[in-house]
Amino acid sequence: MSLYPYAMAALDDVVTVLRAVAEPTRVRVLRLLQQGELTVSDICAITGHSQPRISRHLRILIDAGLLSRHREGSWVYYHRAPQIPAAVLALVDGIDDSDHQMSADAARLDAERHRRRREADEHFSRLAPTWDRERSRITPDAGVESRLLDIVMASNITRDAVVDLGTGTGRILSLLTPLATRAVGIDSNHTMLRHARTAVERTDGAAIELRQADVAATGLPDHTFDLAVAHQLLHFLDSPDMALREAARILKPGGTLIIVDLLAHQDETLRTEHAHRRLGFTSEQIERWCDGVGFDGLTEHRIDHSAGDLLPVCIWQATTTTRNQ
């Protein structure tokens, strides 16, 4: 098994990688990041180690080319590097799930994410009656919706079967329904879905289904939909790439993904007051995630937000590749 299957590596590089991996805590970190990006605080809480100790381990893994990092406001997220050697992944991911340390770490990660989902669910339930109005105070909703419809209608997008991931109050689903034959809205919050049901009942067009489910595990069949939309969803998620992976799974080969979300910004109050997990995204982040789960041909459409104090919004569009078949 070659550490570097696509190129010859210098001896010093191989030794650096082997030294970086040959430490239990660093193996635990690499294994945890299989589940998506984490902050230093996340890793400290799960492993039980101090921040200085974890920071030192992270630096070693970065220097070895095994991890990458990016900053969002005051938080720094760590993820597996795209060029991480396949042999390292095979060793780390090959550890038995029943191993005491691996299972304990996984349980703590699940518990932490469950706690956050519960807090977010309470937030969404509380704001559901005024959700659309609240969102319009920080994003240019009218411009976003108009541009979204232009993209869907003007391009060669098949839209017979549409799924709205994180449908919320059903606003976007109600806009897309007249353009489709079948439309499905997915959301994990029961209160939001109740409001969505009221919204879509007033809409003519496709046969509509609303389902309460995790956007990263919808339970929908493989290769079912022509178009998947994730409108202002990803910034609420701990692991946006998991939702994109699910979208790739349920889309037909050649199906279209449309992401509407905030561009990277620095407004920390959205974390503390509005349950945002991420302070927007760069196109480079979206492209990395899309490429990693089987999308191709990413394009971006930036929305004018010059009026007032609205945050910048972008619409990204990508297509599933044959890797998803």
Predicted segment positions?
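Amphipathic alpha-helical dimerization/coiled-coil segments
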Residues: 2-9, 86-132
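N-terminal helix-turn-helix DNA-binding core of bacterial DNA-binding proteins
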Residues: 9-52, 75-83, 147-149
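Beta-hairpin "wing" of winged helix-turn-helix
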Residues: 63-72, 79
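Conserved alpha-helix/loop element of class I SAM-dependent methyltransferases that forms part
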Residues: 139-160
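Class I SAM-dependent methyltransferase SAM/SAH-binding core
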Residues: 161-163, 169-217
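A short acidic, Gly/Pro-enriched loop at the edge of an enzyme's catalytic core
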Residues: 216-228
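A short glycine-rich, Lys/Arg-flanked "PGG" loop and its adjoining helix->strand segment in the class I
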Residues: 241-256
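C-terminal alpha-helical "lid/dimerization" subdomain adjacent to the S-adenosyl-L-methionine
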Residues: 256-316
